[in-house]
Amino acid sequence: MPQVSLEGLRWYDFYGVELPFSAMAGPRDTRRGVAAGFAHDPLGALLASVNIGVRANAQWGPRIFTAVIRGQITGPGTAALLANCQASYDQASRSEGVTGGQPLGNADVAEEAFRWAAYTPAAAVIDLVSAGPGPQGTTVRASTRLQVVWDGGDWKVIAPPGGDWGNSAAELSSLSGYTLFSGQGGGR
């Protein structure tokens, strides 16, 4: 598996989620809520998986998730992912009184760690650990498998099976075997 240096990695706030970026590996463009312009190397693949995967979520509203899914997600589950995000957003926005396609609010989650499952210059498979608050002050962790492919001069994320990130995620009880992100973000 590739060795990537996390030295020089910096973090920026995306609606309460600290996301990693690198001056050398990207993202180089974060306009309009989309993160693009990743290096064609292992660090670029890792940063793309985190930045694109987080954005392909109903939480951020249709302006962001639609642009991300249509432009940066590929594979047979893409249409289902878009439909699932829209349905989740519609339901949550009604119950929370959010109007005009606005984001549903900040998220209380940290991107904590990763593990390589596979890497070639054409594709990579990365298990990404996210942590959030659980019952009684505990921290709950999940590992989500993200697949990226080099397509059209940038990394794209392959949609999860059935267009549901839950089909690619599993609860995690230990960070053994994972590489912790360092710096401002990545850690609860």
Residue ranges and their predicted role:
Residues 93-133:
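Surface-exposed, charged secondary-structure patches
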Residues 113-116, 143-149:
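Hydrophobic/aromatic beta-strand elements that line small-molecule binding cavities or substrate pockets
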